[in-house]
Amino acid sequence: LEASNRLFIKLVEELHKRGMRIIIDGVFNHCGSFNKWLDRELIYESADGYEVGAFVSPKSPYRNYFLFHRTGENEWPGNGSYDGWWGHDTLPKLNYEDSKELEEYVLGIAKKWVSPPYNVDGWRLDVAADLGRSNEYNHEFWKKFRKAVKEANPHALILAEHYGDPSDWLQGDEWDSVMNYDAFMEPVTWFLTGMEKHSYEYRDDLLGN
């Protein structure tokens, strides 16, 4: 089978016939460094039909999709001073605050896949609390995201990845639920292994407790 939107539509239809639901993953905090918007790996630089990436030229239409800390003309081509998620240069952080176009594009994606003909049943949101450069913008964005999704499909689930206390996002106007590693995975790991996450040290007081 060759991957295509048509095949995906068929997959969702068959799942729904069987009483199953499908949630897709949304990574909206960052993209890959190979993404055509940045093109750090120069995959699209010489390919036909693509705009120049923001890593390659300051004149890229995607320039404001990323926050560059060095902006002199002589920093290009190859400006690696962009924000990366947790400093990872292979995961360039998206710069919504400086690009209304980017925000509108992503909100369009949010709406598209839960609408006909795709009819997906919800979103799982990667590192959702990290999106944006401020807590204020983060909440503003997810309220817009929820509005876009629920207007298109009121039954669609919005499930976000979160570490810690997610209560501020669960007030009925942003996310529906969370994958909470600190509140679930961590204690289950203690109970089953007697070890903390990312640790090789066994502790009797954790096992079975």
Q: For each of these PLM feature ranges, what is it?
A:
Residues 16, 29-30, 35-72, 109, ...:
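Active-site-proximal helices and loops of the catalytic beta/alpha 8
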Residues 1-10, 42-95:
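Aromatic- and acidic-residue-enriched carbohydrate-binding clefts of CAZyme catalytic domains
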Residues 80-84, 117-119, 209:
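Active-site-adjacent bridging/hinge elements
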